[in-house]
Each structure stands twice: as C-alpha cells, then as structure tokens.
C-alpha cells in the first residue's frame, strides 16, 4: 500500500473510498460487488457533515445508490468534568500513561461501558483504574485460582473420562451455567441493538458478582479436596 500522490480534494477522495479502495471500475469488480454497499461505518459526530456526507454524496452521484447501510456516530471524549480537552487548559490526558499502567484493554473496557457510544464520554483516570481492578484483576484471580489447582491435579479439559454430564452436576454448577447462558443471550441481543455499553455492564456484573463473588467462593473447597470425585471434576469442567 502506498500513499496516493495526486489528491484533487480530500473530501472528494474520501468520498470515493467505497470503490477507490478496490481500484474499481478499472479492476476488482467482483470485490466491489461483494462489498457494496458496506454494512456499517463508524466515526465521530463531527463527520456528519464530513466523511458521512461525502461518501453518500459521491455514491448517489456516481451509482445512484447508498454506499453504507448503517452509520454509528460516536460522541466526543471529554475530560472528567465534561469539558473539551485542551492543551491550553491543561486537561489533556496522555493515553500512554494508562497503557503503561492499566493496559490497553482496561481503557477499551472503560470506554465501552462508561456511556452509550453515541453520547459524549467523560474520561476519568480513576474510572480506568477501577475498570482494571474490578474487571481484569477479578478475571485474572479467577483464572489463576483454577489454573493453579488444575495444574496440581494434572487436569486435562480434553479428557472425556473426567467430563461430567449436565444432569449429574451440582445445583451450584447448573446455576452458574444457566446464568452464563442467559448473560450470553442478553449480551448478543444488546449488541444487535447497538447497546454495547449495556452488554459490557452485564458481562462485568456476571464476572464480578455471579462468577467470582458467588460461584468461586462457594467452590473453593471442592478444588482444595485432594481426592478425585465427581463433584471436583464437575467444578473443574
């Protein structure tokens, strides 16, 4: 990929993206036909009169057709007090400070669950730290607990001899599996409705409350048991 040296106008060029990316109509007609119009585009709200418009203007002029079916207009990222970030105000946040401390996934999770994607998001460094501690440390501790004891027991998830059918599992195991199934279905339904923030909050509530605070705490002694049993294998699986 090389940068195009000849640019007539940045908005005209960006508006041609739906077909220019394939060098259509000069070649790749099959690739163009397979992807036009695209299912979804996403940019910040300021692109309403920018890229969103230029794409549609060029497409309707050239093809008499839309070039995208859905559009998500993202809200801007503001400081923790809801004010526009500005170097002159000294309220700009360097993302690398948090990449190096809490990790990129913590920032992604915080930004996803903080507010609806189409709404402005107030970026609070304390919120990133809270997401890291609440969601990711919890996940890590749950994994570490299971992995340590599974390693001591030589547990192999692919071993059919230690697999326990659902109907033979304890009420606690069937409860957490039911909660996980319900959460997954609700997660999918919210994604279909573009309620990504609500889906993320539901997943976090499941991990922290149902899985860690309730299920794992009540299952520790089952894994501490040095004797192999149906109940222990059920918990390991």
Segments predicted by a language model, with ranges:
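Structured secondary-structure scaffolds
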Residues: 1-152, 176-219, 223-224
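Acidic, turn-prone loop/beta-hairpin segments
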Residues: 153-185, 217-237
């Amino acid at each position: 990929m090389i940068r195009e040296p000849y640019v007539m106008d940045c908005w005209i060029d960006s508006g041609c993206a739906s077909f220019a990316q394939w060098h259509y109509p000069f070649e790749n007609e099959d690739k163009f036909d397979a992807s036009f119009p695209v299912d979804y585009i996403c940019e910040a709200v300021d692109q309403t009169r920018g890229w969103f418009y230029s794409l549609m203007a060029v497409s309707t002029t050239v093809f008499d057709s839309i070039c995208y079916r859905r559009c998500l207009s993202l809200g801007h990222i503001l400081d923790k007090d809801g004010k526009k970030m500005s170097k002159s105000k000294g309220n700009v946040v360097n993302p690398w400070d948090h990449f190096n401390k809490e990790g990129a996934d913590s920032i992604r999770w915080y930004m996803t669950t903080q507010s609806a994607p189409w709404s402005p998001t107030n970026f609070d460094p304390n919120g990133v730290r809270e997401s890291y501690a609440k969601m990711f440390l919890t996940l890590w501790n749950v994994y570490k607990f299971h992995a340590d004891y599974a390693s001591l027991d030589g547990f192999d998830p692919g071993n059919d001899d230690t697999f326990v059918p659902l109907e033979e599992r304890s009420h606690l195991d069937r409860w957490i599996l039911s909660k996980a199934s319900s959460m997954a279905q609700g997660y999918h339904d919210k994604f279909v409705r573009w309620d990504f923030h609500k889906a993320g909050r539901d997943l976090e509530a499941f991990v922290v409350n149902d899985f860690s605070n309730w299920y794992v705490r009540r299952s520790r002694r089952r894994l501490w048991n040095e004797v192999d049993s149906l109940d222990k294998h059920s918990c390991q699986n």
